[in-house]
């Protein structure tokens, strides 16, 4: 089980690592994949299945070899029939971090930031497990109009590419509203997540 302090520290570390990558690849788009899982346990078979499906889906779109994890329908295989892909590999860098505070994956692509966001939103919206993935696309300091060395990145919002905000897993309200109001119980969310995983995996 992860404490709140551990979770907050992991978020700070993630932001710091994003800054490091933005400094290293100032003219590219940075993608950060995490898993949305309720409760204090952030690393288990569910989170890893979702994470590796996300890694495979991102590699399928932008290029690369994927996670190598075998799932029935391979999650990304289900998605690959519908996903739009770039015609050649645009992946400059990728990294996976399997942490107790939650799986993290980073991808640097030489695709314009708004196009990268559009492609990542396609994964979130059409992949069988996409609603359990949080795929952030971050502008580099140069892409944000800042100077290299400023140590800042800025996320691209869905509204910038004309998409509505993400919807709740259990109802049609904006997910943010349900999270703030604690509209649904953790048990309800976990049951929904389990049913989504059981629909496409061997677990």
Residue ranges and their predicted role:
Residues 68-70, 87-89, 145, 151:
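A cross-taxon signal for low-complexity, glycine/charged-rich
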Residues 128-142, 152-203:
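Cys/His-clustered metal-coordination modules, chiefly Zn-binding fingers
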Residues 1-64, 90:
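General detector of N-terminal leader/presequence modules that precede the first folded domain
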Residues 37-42, 111-113, 174-177:
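A generic structural motif
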Residues 18-22, 95, 157-158:
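Short beta-strand/turn micro-motifs at beta-sheet edges
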Residues 28-30, 35, 50-70, 90-131:
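Interaction interfaces in information-processing and related assembly proteins
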């Amino acid at each position: 089980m992860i404490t709140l302090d551990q979770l907050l520290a992991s978020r700070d570390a993630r932001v710091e690592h994003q800054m490091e990558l933005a400094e290293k690849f100032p003219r590219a788009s940075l993608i950060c994949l995490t898993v949305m899982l309720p409760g204090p346990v952030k690393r288990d078979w569910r989170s890893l299945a979702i994470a590796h499906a996300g890694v495979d889906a991102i590699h399928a779109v932008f290029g690369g070899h994927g996670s190598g994890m075998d799932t029935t329908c391979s999650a990304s295989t289900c998605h690959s029939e519908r996903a739009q892909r770039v015609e050649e590999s645009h992946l400059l860098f990728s990294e996976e971090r399997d942490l107790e505070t939650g799986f993290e994956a980073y991808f640097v692509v030489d695709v314009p930031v708004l196009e990268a966001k559009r492609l990542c939103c396609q994964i979130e919206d059409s992949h069988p497990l996409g609603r359990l993935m949080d795929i952030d696309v971050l502008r580099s300091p140069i892409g944000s109009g800042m100077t290299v060395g400023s140590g800042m990145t800025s996320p691209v919002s869905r509204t910038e590419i004309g998409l509505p905000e993400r919807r709740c897993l259990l109802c049609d309200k904006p997910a943010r509203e349900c999270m703030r109001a604690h509209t649904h119980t953790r048990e309800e969310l976990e049951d929904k997540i389990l049913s989504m995983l059981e629909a496409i995996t061997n677990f």
